[in-house]
Amino acid sequence: MANFDLTRINCQFLDRHLTFPLLEFLCGKEIYNQQELLEYILETVNKTNMIDYTMDTRKRLNLSQEMPEELVQRKAEVLATLKQLQNEVAPIMKATDILKNGESMKDSKTFVNALQKDYNFKVEHLESAYKLAKYLYECGNYQESTSYLYFCLIVMSPNDKNYLNVLWGKLAAEILTLNWNTALEDLTRLRDYIDSANFSTIQALQQRTWLIHWSVLVFFNHPKGRDLIIEMFLYKPLYLNAIQTMCPHIMRYLATAVVINRTRRNALKDLIKVIQQESYTYRDPITEFLECLYVNFDFEGARLKLHECQTVILNDFFIVACLNEFVEDARLMIFETFCRIHQCITISMLADKLNMKPNEAECWIVNLIRNARLNAKIDSKLGHVVMGTQPLSPYQQLVEKIDSLSMRSEHLAGLIERKSKQKQNQESADSWKYY
């Protein structure tokens, strides 16, 4: 299934350190040649200051059991540079400890005033803290790096030349330390900054494309992520446009989120529209499963695609943890759609569509009706399933209307903004005629 593997594409939009978990995940699969994969990891890790990881990778390649002289020298240089940077930051070390432990210092002005008064804080100290945070990150010490990055966020002005780099670095470090709550906060902060910054159209598109890829790591690991990924990718026109323009392969993760999120079935209609629009640029078993089921009503095709989906998900680092849930919810979708069309069907026919034995299918349907509160009945004597109507709840109708209005409002706001910019540019161009 190498033809459906997105690791190579995804890594183009990730920080070097964020690619290591993906590459290590692939080492446990049989998609690519292990030797070539390890050689690529070694090539990549050599561009960082993670000397121990470099040595470990060399051992896995059977290159050497002892550290080469070149690495010994590099390690000494890394430690020396680290010590030098720590000495430069020493005057504010106590301040970062206070910030780490005290919630009262989270107000930026209060904290900066305290720094200047108690620690003789100077601008060069901020530059040193930034350099140390970046160096610690390059060494793979992500936890300690987050402390200095947080310090920089509190003290720095949003207009500082390094502020955007700090936002990206903080998000990456929190992802790599698996601090998903903080990572979500950093993701929101970074998104707000990108959306309000005075970037050119191309720059904004590039920034959003990178953020989309990084956010997938957060969304599939945070309890609220399944709702948030739908809201951001499907109902925020700027991000949907970035996906359609730069990275249509992200449709895989949006589609997965909708399938495993039973409370957001109202998003299916909008998702299917986007999948159909982008089908000429990107297709995979997950998007094709939804097309088979909701566009073509091809249940045999959906059954075959569901089988392919399992292989795709099993080999995708981002969504592998969702495998069982995806299969269960995909079967539910097949069941609901098939019963809605046919109303009365035999259990044996349904078992065939779900890739199950008749007795397993009956058991599964009974549990489904009981747990999901579906309006359906089973006639065990005749071996029939009779599906009743399942009205959309007022809450679901309200959510659907709000999402639709929100999307239209953002689209209109974007249109007005573009027209305003065009008018300003035209006025600016006309003004040159008088000189």
UniProtKB/Swiss-Prot annotation:
It is found in: Cytoplasm. One of its GO terms (cellular component) is eukaryotic translation initiation factor 3 complex, eIF3e. GO terms for biological process: formation of cytoplasmic translation initiation complex. It holds the Pfam family eIF3_N. GO terms for molecular function: translation initiation factor activity. Residues 219-392 form the PCI domain. Keywords: Cytoplasm, Initiation factor, Protein biosynthesis. InterPro entries: eIF3e, eIF3e_N, PCI_dom, WH_DNA-bd_sf. Belongs to the eIF-3 subunit E family. Component of the eukaryotic translation initiation factor 3 (eIF-3) complex. The eIF-3 complex interacts with pix. Interacts with mxt. Component of the eukaryotic translation initiation factor 3 (eIF-3) complex, which is involved in protein synthesis of a specialized repertoire of mRNAs and, together with other initiation factors, stimulates binding of mRNA and methionyl-tRNAi to the 40S ribosome. The eIF-3 complex specifically targets and initiates translation of a subset of mRNAs involved in cell proliferation. This is Eukaryotic translation initiation factor 3 subunit E. It comes from Drosophila erecta. The gene is eIF3-S6.
